[in-house]
């Protein structure tokens, strides 16, 4: 069950309208690593968690907060658009310089959403459920969460550098702080799970069923041997085994030869040599 609180978690009020920045801000709302993605990712991970209540609660707490961030950013986008009426934009566009700036406005904001946010990226790509990861393996999922928070915080930091609007910067500063917390919480949870299960996912798959002679080889597939200079090659792998550097990749299989397709699929016939 969800209960909506009408107050925002943090203020989301720009100092002035900026349709172009509203378009840019769509990325951290409906882009691949935007707030919609992390909210839905954590929700489905939480709903699918079995028998690990403390992690389920962590996921649901974080997911619910992220829904609030969706609301904050959507509000900010709407406010960046609301005081810039279309007739004023048309008049301003008569100036070539201003016109070139307004020309970058997301037309969806005017045509589709009526000066409101959209569930899409800064380039108008609709948000997709294919962005989220919810595998049922918490260690794998928490690593995906760490990546999502890392990419998301990176994008927020870049947006922070693109504006001098104090109101926008204030909200972005808050989001940066919360992403710092979320990165740290996933790092801590990953460390805890690795201590229980080992660092390789899935830790439940029998090692005897994998070709272990290849399990810790760093294979050189390119010219030169710069990759051999990794300091960690001289240390134990995170799972306790020894690394091995292979300076030249070898082939262990045969040249693949496929049978001709059946006539009913109408493939190109094999060529004659």
From Swiss-Prot:
Co-factor binding comment: Binds 1 Ca(2+) ion per subunit. Binds 2 manganese ions per subunit.
Membership in a protein family: Belongs to the manganese catalase family.
Disordered as annotated region, ranges: 254-273
Assembly behavior: Homohexamer.
Cofactor(s), by name: Ca(2+); Mn(2+)
GO MF term list: metal ion binding; peroxidase activity
Name of this chain's protein: Manganese catalase
InterPro entries per the UniProt record, alphabetical: Ferritin-like, Ferritin-like_SF, Mn_catalase, Mn_catalase_C, Mn_catalase_dom
Pfam families on file: Mn_catalase
Temperature sensitivity of activity: Optimum temperature is 55 degrees Celsius. Exhibits a half-life of 2 hours at 80 degrees Celsius.
Keyword presence, Transcription: no
Superkingdom of origin organism: Bacteria
Keyword terms of this UniProt record: Calcium, Manganese, Metal-binding, Oxidoreductase, Peroxidase
Taxonomy of the source species: Bacteria, Bacillati, Bacillota, Bacilli, Bacillales
Binding residue positions for Ca(2+): 57, 61, 220, 222, 224
Job description of the protein: Catalyzes the decomposition of hydrogen peroxide into water and oxygen. No significant activity could be detected with any of the other tested substrates, including glutathione, pyrogallol, NADH, NADPH and o-dianisidine.
């Amino acid at each position: 069950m969800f209960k909506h609180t009408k107050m925002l978690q943090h203020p989301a009020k720009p100092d002035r309208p900026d349709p172009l920045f509203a378009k840019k801000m769509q990325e951290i709302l409906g882009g691949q690593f935007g707030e919609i993605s992390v909210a839905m990712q954590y929700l489905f991970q939480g709903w699918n968690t079995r028998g690990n209540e403390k992690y389920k609660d962590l996921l649901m707490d974080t997911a619910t907060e992220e829904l609030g961030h969706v609301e904050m950013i959507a509000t900010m986008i709407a406010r960046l658009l609301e005081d810039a009426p279309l007739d004023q934009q048309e008049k301003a566009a008569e100036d070539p310089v201003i016109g070139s700036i307004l020309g970058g406005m997301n037309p969806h904001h005017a045509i589709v959403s009526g000066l409101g946010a959209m569930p899409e990226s800064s380039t108008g790509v609709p948000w997709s459920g294919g962005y989220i990861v919810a595998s049922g393996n918490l260690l794998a999922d928490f690593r995906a969460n760490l990546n999502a928070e890392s990419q998301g915080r990176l994008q927020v930091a870049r947006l922070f550098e693109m504006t001098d609007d104090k109101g926008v910067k204030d909200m972005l500063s808050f989001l940066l702080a919360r992403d710092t917390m979320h990165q740290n919480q996933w790092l801590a949870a990953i460390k805890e799970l690795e201590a229980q299960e080992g660092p390789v996912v899935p830790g439940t798959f029998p090692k005897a069923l994998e070709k272990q002679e290849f399990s810790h080889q760093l294979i050189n597939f390119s010219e030169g041997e710069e990759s051999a200079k990794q300091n960690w090659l001289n240390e134990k792998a995170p799972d306790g085994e020894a690394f091995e550097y292979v300076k030249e990749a070898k082939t262990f299989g045969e040249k693949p030869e496929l049978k001709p397709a059946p006539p009913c699929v109408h493939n190109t016939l094999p060529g004659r040599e």
